[in-house]
Regions:
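Short C-terminal tail/terminal secondary-structure segment
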Residues: 82, 93-107
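Conserved catalytic loop/helix region of short-chain dehydrogenase/reductase
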Residues: 1-4, 19, 42
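Alpha-helical segment proximal to the catalytic Tyr-Lys
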Residues: 21-25, 90
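Active-site helix of classical SDR
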Residues: 8, 16
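A glycine/serine/threonine-rich, flexible loop-to-helix segment
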Residues: 25, 37-65
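Non-catalytic, hydrophobic alpha-helical segments
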Residues: 77-78, 84
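Conserved SDR Rossmann-fold cofactor-binding beta-strand/turn motif
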Residues: 29-39, 85, 98-100
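A conserved structural motif in NAD(P)-dependent oxidoreductases
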Residues: 54, 66-77
Length: 107
């Protein structure tokens, strides 16, 4: 599944650049968020189904892979999305925001 996941991530980034180039003259901005692990019910369900009785240990292992020491919270991702859509970010287009607790650059 790593191949499909990586390909999809790359596709979102290049699609963002294409949209930004194609629509910038119309005043339409395009940016993308590139999060690392986000603590959602999906993570909890995955751990429960795949590591019964070891969920807490596996959760700690997942968090330890993040330089910041934890997974993102959905509200943190939403806050960046709200900013990108706001007038405060009116000069931002064609950008990819790594919101990953340092995973990309500090790992």
């Amino acid at each position: 599944d790593r191949f499909a996941y990586s390909t999809s991530k790359g596709a979102v980034y290049t699609m963002t650049l294409s949209i930004a180039r194609d629509y910038v003259k119309r005043g339409i901005r395009a940016n993308c968020l590139c999060p690392a692990r986000v603590h959602t019910p999906f993570v909890d369900n995955y751990l429960r189904e795949n590591y019964p009785g070891k969920e807490a240990a596996m959760f700690s292992e997942l968090e330890a892979t993040q330089p910041i020491g934890r997974m993102a919270k959905p509200d943190e991702i939403a806050a960046l999305a709200a900013y990108i859509c706001s007038e405060e970010a009116a000069f931002v287009t064609g950008a990819a925001f790594d919101i990953d607790g340092g995973f990309t650059l500090l790992k």
